[in-house]
Amino acid sequence: MLDAKRKWLLICLGLFISIFFLTVTNSPPAQKPPIKVGLLLPYTGTMPLQAKGVTDGVELYFDEIGRKAGGRPIQLFKEDTELNPTVGLTKVRRLVEDHNVNFIIGPVHSGVALAIHDYIRKQKVIQVNPTAFTRELTSPQKASENIFRVCETTDQSNFPMGMWIVKNTPHRNIVITGSDFAAGHHSVEAFKAGFEEAGGKVVKDVFPKMGTMDFAPFLTTIDVKGADAVYAWFAGTDAVRFDQQYEEFGLKKRLPLFGHNVITDDPYLASIGDAALGIITAGHYSYTLDTPENRAFVKAYQGKYGETPSRYSEFGYTAANVVGAVAEASKGEVEDIPRVAKEIKRVATKIETPAGPLAFDKYNQRITNIYVLKAEKMDGKLANVVIGKIEKVAQEDVWKWWNK
């Protein structure tokens, strides 16, 4: 009798164990924690359209991959730098210390990027800088294994543009002008170096403060004897006011206006209006670029947002692509920063962005095509139309004038 009971208990125990293991085996696996991505952008201030473009590009790419990479969901956190370096440092601390983000995409402003640089390089986080393009950030003196940049530097577009103007136009005596902060100075000074190396001469430089409302006093000083053109760097609403007042002042007819693409930025072209017509600029992207990758990007972007993408949209899209690609290649294991940093360089070479092939140099700076653009009417709408191309410009090719 006892043996029968014992057998019955053993049978029941065996059935229980079998049912338990079947249940465990057939249960869905526990979901992995999300990959956290922080957007550190100026949603308020004078550059909200830049922030919108980056954000829209990021969201489009992550939507295309189902908000998931490497088997982990992707979670976004947004912080407003207010275009203020002190605020930017506070907000990046919040992303890292409160939200524990794995990646940071941002900022836009070079001053903010420099303010957060030393903090970022000490953290277990990867920063993909979409827009801040002062040359310092990826210089040998400041480069860091966990900081990447997908926009061009101040040298990469402006230095070769100086050479392009000498080669392709009759202008040899130019006034340079830009906003009185790091990116403004570095941009027009890089242009000066390339222009003078090619045989041109800069006859004057003028640096209004960022946020200048009335450019008349500066336009008076720009109009100097012997000058035959002007090269400018102004961003956001500063560019709108400068371009409009430049034309109102009657300068454009006798002093053609050139510059970096910020002075005819796509998000601000409609506000600038016909004052933008004929301005020739250098930049890494235009939605008018005729490649299969860009046509697909423009179609998807228009389908989602009902408008054409700006260069900020491409920056954001490419930054998100870097994050998604490395997360996928790493099978979601993105916490080992040195390994992830090495993996980014490997996967980047397989990415064909809307602006062209992607690659990073040894300082984690993007090597990029630079396009010469002219503001024209296209289908009744102002657009930066591609009229020239400078291929695969690396920062090491164009920084010799200061990095000696």
Residue positions per predicted region:
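Extracytosolic ligand-binding ectodomains
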Residues: 2-404
